[in-house]
Structure formats: structure tokens, C-alpha cells
Regions:
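N-terminal intrinsically disordered, cationic/polar leader segments
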Residues: 1-196
């Protein structure tokens, strides 16, 4: 079973996270930020990952450190759960329609950290959550797997719908990328023999 628990503690956030890549989409998330909780719950559900996460952050300042550090911790958890990435499919992508919004998420668990964030929301906030924190979350994630992650928005007017499509699409794309390829269970999916 590919399941890990990690802790990440800084002067800004204290995070405990348990991730099971072979789960059923169960979640228990408390980041101190309702919108981020909602997005992570959608991510876990649509990726079929079991996720238990608590974060105590300096939310009296804003949600920036919480979003960034949770992304870092989630990336670290994926890295630990995947190990040397033997037998995985490596690549995954998903077009996610959410009402009028349409977003592509494409992932390569390459060992190389890249985020392409081609998402354009028309508002700067959803409730009291700064929209720019979402790209910081995914940058922290990509750097710590490490992985190449692309988000490309094709349509969308409603900021909540656009960001929801991003998190659901990422869950679906990552579910495909981490899936074990039964025909190549013992192989590392790279001609180099190593994913770095």
C-alpha cells in the first residue's frame, strides 16, 4: 500500500498529512481556510486518494503561507508514497468541464519541477481567499514531487468554477499518472532508468 504520513513545521505553519494513493477518495481536511478545504476535498475525491490533513497557519495574516505550505507538504507526501516510481504510468491528463469552465490538467511525474499556470480568473478573491494562492499551492506541489504540471484554461467566467475545475482535473490526472501499469510493474518509466 502506498500510504505515508508526514509532518512539516515552520514558524508559519504546522502541518500533519496522511496520504493513501490507493484509497477510495475519503478525506478529512482542516486547513483553517474553507475554500482551500473544499478544493482539497474535491482533489481527493476525484483522484480517489485518501487524505487526512490538518494545518495550523498564520491565517491572521492571510492564507498565502497556508496554501503554499500545504502544497509543499502534499508534494512531499506524493514523493514519499511513490518512492522510486517503479511501475507507475508516469503521465496523466484530464479535461475537466465545470459548468461554463473548461480546464486541462496534464502531469508528468518526471522528477523535474515545472508549473505552467495558464489560468485567468476575472476576480482576485473567492470569498476571503486570494486567487493567486492557488498557483502558489501548485508551484509548491510541483517542486516537491517533483513533477511537471500544466494547467490550461479553455473557457470559464466564474472564478470558483475555474479553480474547482483545476483541482478536480488535477486529481483525475494524478490518479492516472500514479496508477500501476500491470504490464510494466517492475520498471521505472524512463529510458534513463531513473526519474530525477
Amino acid at each position: 500500500m502506498r500510504e505515508v504520513t508526514i509532518e512539516r513545521n515552520t514558524n508559519e505553519t504546522q502541518i500533519e498529512l496522511t496520504l493513501n494513493l490507493d484509497g477510495a477518495g475519503r478525506y478529512q481536511v482542516d486547513t483553517g481556510c474553507g475554500f482551500l478545504n473544499h478544493m482539497l476535498e474535491l482533489f481527493a475525491r476525484h483522484g480517489r486518494f485518501d487524505l487526512v490533513l490538518t494545518c495550523h497557519g498564520d491565517v491572521e495574516v492571510d492564507y498565502h503561507h497556508t496554501a503554499e505550505d500545504v502544497g509543499i507538504a502534499l508534494g512531499q507526501a506524493f514523493a514519499a508514497a511513490l518512492g522510486e516510481m517503479r511501475g507507475i504510468r508516469r503521465y496523466g491528463n484530464f479535461y475537466l468541464p465545470m459548468d461554463e469552465a473548461l480546464v486541462l490538467c496534464a502531469v508528468d511525474l518526471s522528477g523535474r519541477a515545472t508549473l505552467n499556470w495558464d489560468v485567468h480568473c476575472k476576480t482576485e478573491k473567492v470569498g476571503d481567499f486570494d486567487v493567486e494562492c492557488v498557483s502558489e499551492f501548485w508551484l509548491g506541489f510541483a517542486r516537491n514531487v517533483p513533477a511537471t504540471v500544466h494547467f490550461v484554461q479553455f473557457a470559464g467566467e466564474n472564478t470558483h468554477h475555474i479553480l474547482e475545475a483545476c483541482f478536480k482535473g488535477a486529481g483525475r490526472a494524478l490518479a492516472e499518472a500514479v496508477r500501476i501499469d500491470a504490464a510494466h510493474r517492475d520498471e521505472i518509466p524512463s529510458t534513463k532508468g531513473l526519474l530525477v
